[in-house]
Curated annotation (Swiss-Prot):
It comes from Shewanella pealeana (strain ATCC 700345 / ANG-SQ1). The lineage of its organism: Bacteria, Pseudomonadati, Pseudomonadota, Gammaproteobacteria, Alteromonadales. GO terms for biological process: ribosomal small subunit assembly; translation. Coiled coil: none annotated. This is Ribosome maturation factor RimP. Belongs to the RimP family. Pfam families: DUF150_C (PF17384), RimP_N (PF02576).
Amino acid sequence: MATLERKLVEMLKAPVEALGHKLWGLEYIQAGKHSILRLYIDNEKGIFIEDCAEASRQVSAVMDVEDPISTEYTLEVSSPGVDRPLFTAEQYQAYIGETVKVQLTMPVAGSRNLKGTVTGVDGQMLNLSVDGNELIVALDNIRKGNLIAKF
């Protein structure tokens, strides 16, 4: 996770939790002159559109005061959904035995894109079974990770 994203998580965690939600994670996507700050919130009951709107208002107020992003950006707030993005060791740990897709910064076993079953998490290392091969991936090498939903 980049330094700005870490700062944003620290800044926005408390306001989201004050609403009774958990800050599942966030993505800051730079797209030319305009950027997107995407927050994922969750709770045990599920997230509804009203929850997203309320969190958006709360987060906007904090962002206006703190002003951590100097360029124009769009704030998006949503639930993680069924193909939820995974950001932390704890989140990967919760999905041991499930299939995930990860995009890597640096290749592992010759690939930057892996799809496999989470077999464990050891500190900041993800154990992943890909086509019968056990791979170890550093969490800081994961650019993006998502749970693959089963239907």
